[in-house]
Every structure is written in structure tokens, then in C-alpha cells.
Amino acid sequence: LYMYLKKKGYNDNELRETGLFTYDEKRGVTDKFWNRVMFPIMDANNRVIAFGGRVMGDAKPKYLNSPETKVFDKSRNLYGLNVARSSRKDYFLICEGYMDVISLHQAGFNNAVAALGTAFTQRHATLIKRYVKEVVLTFDSDEAGIKAALRAIPYLRDAGLAIKVLNMKPYKDPDEFIKALGREAYEERIKNATNFFI
């Protein structure tokens, strides 16, 4: 990618600002997302503003996002918002990751969004409030997912959003659930999601 962009006339300073490369004295310039499946991160107006990458294999970190730039602020964007904002649903499904959003969109739940590899923030809740009045939390069913949901709830409540929590068990996440049981079963879980009051 680096050589391609250099041939297209971009200089090193311009390329450094993209966040697509790493620079060090020992190895020189390397592609930051080498050997990763790439997820374009788009703003609410369908403009690509960053990338996420999932490693193939066991290397760490498993997921890697573009660094924050003038156009990309993780706390001001949600993965999938460009699709969800046009949904006919009056609520958003909030999940943890790219694959969950993609799986839900493919199953017809185009109202799914996720925070971008960061903890859910008040800014995320305020952004969601622009589009809907209710959310259904579909975070992972493991301990980390439960803790993440409990941290998100006060922000959502403070933004004035109605909150429901979807029981994912015995599955770990929406992607796994839909692959195992399908769209109709997930729709039923949404209907039976628990209202959350604090």
C-alpha cells in the first residue's frame, strides 16, 4: 500500500497523517494493517473516515483501529451508524463489535451499531439520541460484556433513552446467536428483552 501511494504522488508527511502506516528506525515504514481483514469505518454521511482490522491467526492485538485523526474521533462515531440512521426501526441494537453489526445487518437488523473498539461513552449516547428514543443492549454474554453493558447504561439513561437488555445466553454474541438460531429467534429475543430501570 505504501509503495502504491508513493507512486501516486503522496509524500511521507501526507501518508503519516493517514494512520495507515507505522514508522520506526529498525523496520522503516510498514503497513499497519498487514495480514488483517479490513473494515471501513464510515461516518453518518457514508464517508470512509478510518479503518478497523482483524488479524488472521493468533497475533495480538486481535482488532486494530486507525488512530484518531482530524476526521476520526472514536467517541463521536459508531460502527454501522451510516446504515442504522436510515432504519425504519424506532430503536438501535447496540453491540460490541464489527462482526456483530455485520451479522445483524445481513440478517435484516439494519438498526445495529457498535462503539469503535473503545468503551461506550456519553458522546455515543448523545449521538444515538439524535436518531432514536430507545436502545436494546446486545453486548456479549460473558463477564466482560456484562460489565460493558453496566457501564453503558448510566450514559444511555442520562441521555434520556429507554433501555432494554437482550438475553443472549447460551450464545456469546449476536453473530454466534444468529448463526446458530437465525433471524426469527433473534427477533423473538428482542421482543422479550428486559426493560432496564435504575
Go through each PLM region and give its residues.
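Phosphate-handling DNA/RNA-contact segment within nucleic-acid enzymes
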Residues: Y2-Y131, V135, A148-A149
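Alpha-helical interaction elements
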Residues: M99, F109, D158-G160, L166-M168
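Flexible glycine/proline-rich, aromatic-decorated loop/lid segments
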Residues: A125-I128, P154-L156, N195
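Short, hinge-like loop/turn segments at secondary-structure boundaries
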Residues: Y131-V132, I153-Y155, A180-E187
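Phosphate/diphosphate-binding loops
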Residues: E143-R157, I163
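Short gly/pro/ser/thr-enriched loop/turn and capping motifs at secondary-structure boundaries
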Residues: A119-T121, A144-I146, Y171-D173
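Short glycine-centered, acidic/aromatic-flanked micro-motifs in structured strand/loop junctions
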Residues: F139-S141
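C-terminal or mid-to-C-terminal helical accessory/interaction module adjacent to the motor/catalytic core
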Residues: A162-I198
